[in-house]
Amino acid sequence: MWTHPIAYDVIVVGAGHAGCEAAYCSAKMGVSVLMLTSNLDTIAKLSCNPAVGGIGKGHIVREIDALGGIMAEVTDQSGIQFRILNQTKGPAVRAPRAQVDKQLYHIHMKRLLENTPGLHIMQATVESLLDKEGVISGVTTKEGWMFSGKTVVLSSGTFMRGLIHIGDRNFSGGRLGDPSSQGLSEDLKKRGFPISRLKTGTPPRLLASSINFSCMEEQPGDLGVGFVHRTEPFQPPLPQLSCFITHTMEKTKAIISANLHRSALYGGCIEGVGPRYCPSIEDKIVKFSDKERHHVFLEPEGLHTQEIYANGLSTSMPFDVQYDMIRSVLGLENAIITRPAYAIEYDYIHGNVIHPTLESKLIEGLFLCGQINGTTGYEEAAAQGLIAGINAVNKVFNRPPFIPSRQESYIGVMLDDLTTQILDEPYRMFTGRAEHRLLLRQDNACARLSHYGYELGLLSEERYELVKKQNQLLEEEKVRLQKTFRQYGQSVVSLAKALSRPEVSYDMLREAFPNDIRDLGAVLNASLEMEIKYSGYIDRQKILIQSLEKAESLLIPEDLDYKQITALSLEAQEKLAKFTPRTLGSASRISGIASADIQVLMIALKKHAHH
């Protein structure tokens, strides 16, 4: 076996969305990085939908940007439609989403990585890990090469023993057209990693020229919406396209119902559990049998292709059923399928062997990120890649780990959830997973997290100073409006009080009091309005967080023997030993741990501290 002459600080295995963030941020932080991928032409490939963001997910992309990651930048460069979802709802659940050109997304990401100093990219398929007495030392590849590394970041996506299903036919693959990885999964099993199966799926792609868009609802984008933090409204660099909405018909339901036994999902071919919030069309027909129709969103895959992503028609039906099903949908009567829908099963590792830093508990220096940890979605994967890359570098330099808390970020919510829960389905981020979501809005991600990005060396001083200046300006304006009183309606009130009324907007106040209300630009105007309008709720959540911080920050020693704490319930002893939470707050969120057990543990920790 040939040994590569260069020893790297960080080796990243896989070049999906997790791997790209891990490789970029590691190199940006000043270490030598090698990224290995089985195909250089599929770097950052959007394997499923041609979109980034959405509810919860868009918040994560903004947080990645605030910390100095690259998903937001590449999305803005590649976007062919930008929207804000939930505009009629409260600010906590409003979220940016972009349709992107799949080819351009790959091209922009590959170019960015290739031009990152300290980052080497190479085509090779990793088959096994190398370690010395439980400490990672490198990897070996199918090609017969060995690479040495102080740390390894594993981001294998759906490739570990990936199995593709189309009806009763199944075959090995990491995604349609790409081989799966067999050796790596076997190597991890031999090392004692608990591994189970999950499933995901993707709908068929259709030829645009064969679709009758005239009978569908057109869905254009919104102006001025991007992902990278800016002071002024975003101007997309690419031409913008519309999506279209149609729906299934009674005939669609009949076709699917008559062929359920031929679905890989319902025919018993699939053992892995699929994502609850992204069900297949056959799942929707069965679970929502009272509904006569289901929405289908037709999303363009790019500017230079006619392929259309049929969002809402994910299925594992055989191709002949897919053909009939597609042609039963309104406007798709003559649709031509360019790529079939399929389901894919893959291996993932249980969260109880992963630290919140995303370092493995079984092999020191091995970090895991993305779908290997049981998540689904590009955004969740990218965020994990960022955290894994940061902490791999911290490991190399013997620095303290970086773990954003669930009180300050959706990324922190995800890290905590993944390492304190046993997943029975792929994990997807929603705003409802956060206890303090009004504080974790998509518009204030930079205010919350940019100081970390700057301290880590991922954000430039210029960018950080801009964020600080904006934060200071918002705070000064908020105080000024609280102290400025004017006649408004029947009474004299502060302008902040006037703005807090539901029917009053910042623009309305600017028109009424042009000498008192400053125009800070559309982006800051909107943020200031939300901060003032919801200040009562925000202040209450901040007080609640302060009261919880003591429990959240109370560290649990790694060598604590839970069996010796006899007042703990047997279930609590077993689950605490299994997950080994870092803090009392994390312990409290493990399923099956009662509040009485937390009280007992708190007393035990205080006694332990005295000793």
UniProtKB/Swiss-Prot annotation:
NAD(+) binds at residues 274-288. Keywords: Cytoplasm, FAD, Flavoprotein, NAD, tRNA processing. This is tRNA uridine 5-carboxymethylaminomethyl modification enzyme MnmG. GO terms for biological process: tRNA methylation; tRNA wobble uridine modification. It is found in: Cytoplasm. Signal peptide: none annotated. PROSITE patterns: GIDA_1, GIDA_2. InterPro entries: FAD/NAD-bd_sf (IPR036188), GIDA_C_N (IPR049312), MnmG (IPR004416), MnmG-rel (IPR002218), MnmG-rel_CS (IPR020595), MnmG_C (IPR026904), MnmG_C_subdom (IPR047001), MnmG_C_subdom_sf (IPR044920). Its cofactor is FAD. NAD-binding protein involved in the addition of a carboxymethylaminomethyl (cmnm) group at the wobble position (U34) of certain tRNAs, forming tRNA-cmnm(5)s(2)U34. Belongs to the MnmG family. GO terms for molecular function: flavin adenine dinucleotide binding. Homodimer. Heterotetramer of two MnmE and two MnmG subunits. SUPFAM superfamilies: FAD/NAD(P)-binding domain. NCBIfam families: mnmG_gidA. One of its GO terms (cellular component) is cytosol. It comes from Chlamydia pneumoniae. FAD binds at G14, A15, G16, H17, A18, G19, V126, S181, Q371. It holds the Pfam family GIDA.
